[in-house]
Amino acid sequence: SAALLGPAALASTMQTSTNARYGMVVQSKGKVTRIDKAGNILWQYECGYNSHDIRMLPNGNVLVTTQPSVIEEITPDKKVVWSWKGKAVAPHDGPIEIHSFERLDNGNTIISESGNKRIIEVDPKGTIVHSIALTVEKPDWHRDTRRVRRTDTGTFLVAHEGMGLVREYDKTAKVLWEHKLELGAEAATPGANGHGVSIFNVLSLKNGNVLIGGGNNNRVYEVDRSGKTVWSIERDELKTVDGKAIHLCWVTSLNVLRNGNLVFATAFAGPDQPILVEVNRKKEVLWAKYPDTTIGDDVCAFWLTDIKGSVIR
């Protein structure tokens, strides 16, 4: 296992970003930052906003939300070559927030719009070529959705933050499957360090199961299609290789590596807790990255850049 670099070691290594292990693009402190596996800052773009999704495209550009309702594709020389601004569509007349997007191989972009309660596919010219109306019983322009991810069968898994549940939709907007988050034994509490059912992320795994980044449910867990939990990482279950307790707060991005390891983000846990953690299926912590002056404890979106093989994210 790799040695972990805890907070006490940060003072002497502040010039870049500490204990990177992987190259990555991260949104934190209102900046998009690309670092190499040594932690050297390769590129930084200041936008004053923290995105809930991020994508490093094959052409080297970065796709990111730079305002609550704006997605931009940014080149390495910081030119914006494509953008989308969400606008209210009747009957909705309030704000729009974009928490999830994906660039398709055909050049189109999948976008989820909270407020409009829809998933849209937009071509490079900005024309909507397909739209899926989401079923949202408790509309909230900030919380209708978090991450939305396509499956290999062409359906969409949607994390409905405000309702604390996952729904799977087909292209006709039919709900095929649903899973509701539970509080468990812990009562609901407010705040960044609180506990609830505000789901953030959802991924379709190769075995057909669904992996959930619970947001303030403070855990990662895998469910089968009957809704049974078959694997989980609970809030205070993990320890670093040197025995220090890891306390999960807002569990956000998930990257499942080819070898089955999981790299995930946990936000708002404070300066003494990791922001990125890699675990294997035995729940052994292989690596953890702590906040530093470049990347803080507010990470909701990261993208590993130098990983061999396919990554589910």
Can you say where each PLM-predicted feature lies in the sequence?
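Histidine-/acidic-rich catalytic cores in large beta-rich domains
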Residues: S12-R313
